[in-house]
Curated annotation (Swiss-Prot):
Gene3D superfamilies in the record: Vaccinia Virus protein VP39
Organism: Swinepox virus (strain Kasza)
Cell compartments where the protein resides: Virion
Keyword Oxidoreductase: no
Gene (name only): OPG102
Keywords for the protein's UniProt record, in alphabetical order: Elongation factor, Methyltransferase, mRNA capping, mRNA processing, Protein biosynthesis, S-adenosyl-L-methionine, Transcription, Transferase, Virion
GO terms of molecular function: mRNA (nucleoside-2'-O-)-methyltransferase activity
Family: Belongs to the class I-like SAM-binding methyltransferase superfamily. Poxvirus/kinetoplastid 2'-O-MTase family.
Listed name of the protein: Cap-specific mRNA (nucleoside-2'-O-)-methyltransferase
Family matches, as Pfam families: PARP_regulatory
Amino acid sequence: MEPLSIDKPFMYFDEINNELEYDPDSANEKHKKFPYQGQLKLLLCELFFLSKLQRHGILDGSTIVYIGS
C-alpha cells in the first residue's frame, strides 16, 4: 500500500451542508468545571461529525476505523 499525501483534509465539517457551526466567542470561555470536560466535548463532537456524515450518505459503502481522541 502506497501512502497518499493530500493538500487538505478529505472534507471539512462545513462542506457537508455548507454551514459553519463555530462560535468565535468560544475562544474566550472560562475554564471547565472538571478536568476532562474538554475531552468529553471533543469525543461528542467527533461522534456527531460521523453521524452527520452517515445521515448525508457520505459514508455509504465505507468501512470506518475510528481512532478517537
